[in-house]
Regions:
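Hydrophobic aliphatic residues
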Residues: 18, 320, 545-548, 577, ...
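Gly/Gly-Pro-rich "capping" loops immediately C-terminal to redox-active cysteine motifs
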Residues: 517, 528-570, 590-593
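Extracytoplasmic/secreted envelope proteins and their assembly/folding machinery
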Residues: 102, 106, 207, 274, ...
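C-terminal capping alpha-helices of c-type cytochrome domains
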Residues: 567-611
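Sequence/structural segment immediately N-terminal to covalent heme-attachment motifs in c-type
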Residues: 508-532, 541, 603
Length: 611
């Protein structure tokens, strides 16, 4: 990295630098899962977005026997996780930590037999914080009433220096007070809509709650350091409800909280889990496929990339960050609530960086108030002669994460003998396919938008860590969401539409035919019949009676149909509808036929009216 700070990187400059700056590169995806798909191919489901939600959904769809295409705009998979390689080392520049309380991701880790490593700074030997222009550590006189709480909170006596226990005890008390009301707001934190008690807190920001506490500057600085790393966003923009949710999910305990959000990681990076899931599901994958438009019509979905490539499917899943959803054109248009949420954006937009340092690196955690460029700095790799630090800040406007001098200044406030030699970071706020870090909803957004973001719209379903119910903003939440939506789509395509989805499904499949005609609706799953004449998975059915078989323009009919060399008379239609495979051996049409002669007659009569 350069030793001198330069001008702010533009979004255009960021795109030019993707994957190649300073020798940092995305680790490759191995296996057949990386094989591309040809434009014009037809699929059962298209998944837009190759983060953990999209990869999870694609795997589940493939396990259900559905032909699945995964489209990713970047030149890598992973979304807001990114295992980057620098020399012989790898760094998780995005999502990183996991825990057994996060049941979805932990089940995947166990399923694939992946190995776990620990972050030393999560159980620090020293706890420091910056207040009133100097470094502080806890004093015994201030701490004795809380010391027992820190020692006993997880049922065991930690083997840590007394001064560290003092610092952790102060933090435990502050965190407990800050999150008062979490149990009432989220009695079942993995099912937030079980109760509406959380609505009483939804208009409150993190800043509002801090102001209510009326803390001393010293105590507020310690608490703000912790919250700054959690929010990765300005406190005035961050919903207090999000921090209550994290606390409730962590069992309302500071030790479990720290373990869940910053201690345990995949030894070989998040890419190791992503690879395992891809090789298990083996969907078709197309990288560099930025989607411009998603069209629905006549029971099919057409996805068009910015390069003009077009793919068709019976359904689609948009597994995208909330902040970028509005940048894709949808026809029919999205629910206004989804568009408004995307344009408002969630608050997460801060900084995560690694700093390689020279000098003796202890296991430590350092905290600073929101006004400082970095909220939290802690040990990733300790060593006598050097190591690696991880740091978080609430805004990229306060620090250039790629500037060695800027990071050096922040680190030396706590440990003046350390020399920063290199920084490694990724500008998530500049990446047009993320436009921010993990999801931290703004005040009021959970009430206004969360339920709407999760609702399907016709044949398009929505997934992502930003709309998870439990660990929203975590890898676990992305996997939760991808699993749920994949199984909804499988149920829909199998004809088992859940009651909550029925209205949306009916609206999507509404055609210019008699309402409630069940036989025709079987056809409408694959065949459009609107006046545009555009095709879906199957050819458009408007004007079929009396037309030469396999003659509709711009549709790739199978040789089985082209060889019939006849017209669609009522007799031909009846024979084909009774048993397509028998009438046209080798047809690609995956439909068993209509057994009832009266149903076939009604369907043929209906088709004759579509002119």
């Amino acid at each position: 990295m350069p030793d001198e700070p330069g001008p702010r990187t533009s979004r255009r400059g960021f795109l030019k630098a993707l994957g190649g700056a300073a020798g940092v590169a995305a680790l490759p995806i191995r296996g057949e899962a990386s094989v591309g798909a040809a434009p014009g191919d037809d699929y059962d489901v298209i998944v837009i977005g190759g983060g953990f939600a999209g990869v999870t959904a694609a795997r589940e769809l493939r396990h259900a026997g559905l032909r699945t295409l995964l489209l990713e705009a970047r030149n890598r998979l992973g979304g807001r996780t990114f295992t980057a390689k620098l020399g012989d080392e790898h760094f998780d520049l995005g999502g990183m930590w996991v825990h057994w309380m996060q049941a979805n991701v932990w089940a995947e880790i166990a399923r694939y037999g992946l190995q776990i490593a620990e972050t030393p700074g999560a159980i620090p030997e020293r706890v420091l914080w910056w207040s009133d222009g100097k470094v502080r550590e806890a004093g015994v006189g201030e701490i004795l009433p809380l010391l027992g709480q820190a020692i006993c909170s997880n049922g065991a006596t930690p083997e840590l220096p007394l001064r560290t226990l003092e610092g952790l005890a102060v933090l435990a008390g502050l965190m407990s007070d800050f999150h008062e009301g979490a149990a009432q707001a989220f009695p079942r934190p993995m099912d937030p809509f079980f109760s509406d008690a959380w609505k009483a807190f939804d208009a409150v920001s993190v800043k509002d709650r801090l102001d209510q506490m009326q803390l001393s500057a010293d105590r507020r600085a310690l608490l703000e350091g912790t919250l700054g790393a959690s929010c990765c966003a300005p406190f005035a923009n961050s919903g207090f409800i999000e921090m209550l949710r994290w606390w409730a999910l962590s069992g309302q305990d500071v030790q479990r909280y720290g373990d869940a959000v910053a201690r345990f990681k995949l030894r070989d990076g998040t890419i190791s889990l992503l690879e395992a899931m891809l090789e298990d599901g083996r969907p078709d994958v197309r990288l560099g496929a930025s989607v411009a438009r998603v069209e629905q019509g006549g029971g099919a979905v057409r996805v068009i990339t910015e390069r003009g490539e077009s793919f068709r499917a019976r359904a689609a899943i948009a597994a995208l960050p909330m902040n970028v959803l509005a940048n894709i054109e949808f026809s029919p248009p999205l629910d206004p609530a989804k568009v408004a949420a995307s344009r408002e954006r969630h608050a997460g937009s801060g900084v995560k960086l690694y700093a390689r340092v020279r000098g003796e690196v202890p296991s430590f955690a350092a905290f600073a108030p929101e006004s400082e460029p970095l909220s939290m700095i802690f040990t990733s790799e300790a060593g006598k002669e050097g190591g690696v630090l991880i740091a978080f800040g609430t805004s990229p406007e306060k620090i250039d994460a790629h500037s060695v001098p800027a990071v050096q200044q922040a680190v030396r406030k706590f440990l003046p003998d350390l020399s920063v030699t290199e920084t490694i970071a990724y500008d998530w706020h500049l990446d047009p396919y993320s436009l921010g870090t993990w999801c931290i909803l703004r005040p009021g957004q959970m009430t206004k938008y969360l339920a709407k973001l999760r609702e399907p719209e016709g044949l398009v379903h929505f997934a992502g860590g930003d709309m998870a119910l439990g660990w929203r903003g975590f890898i676990d939440g992305a996997i939760e969401s991808g699993n749920r939506v994949a199984h909804e789509v499988v149920a829909r395509l199998a004809g088992r539409v859940r009651p909550a989805e029925s209205a949306a499904a009916t609206a999507a499949m509404a055609l210019e035919v008699a309402p409630g005609d069940a036989v025709f609706r079987q056809c409408a799953v694959c065949h459009p019949s609107d006046a545009s004449g555009q095709h879906g998975v199957g050819p458009n059915l408007r004007g079929v009676p009396g037309r030469k078989i396999a003659s509709a323009p711009d549709y790739p009919f199978s040789e089985a149909l082209r060889s019939l060399d006849s017209t669609w008379s009522p007799e031909q239609l009846d024979a084909f509808l009774a048993n397509p495979a028998q009438r046209a051996p080798g047809t690609k049409m995956a439909f068993g036929g209509v057994a009832s002669a009266s149903d076939r007659a009604a369907l043929i009569e209906l088709l004759s009216k579509l002119r």
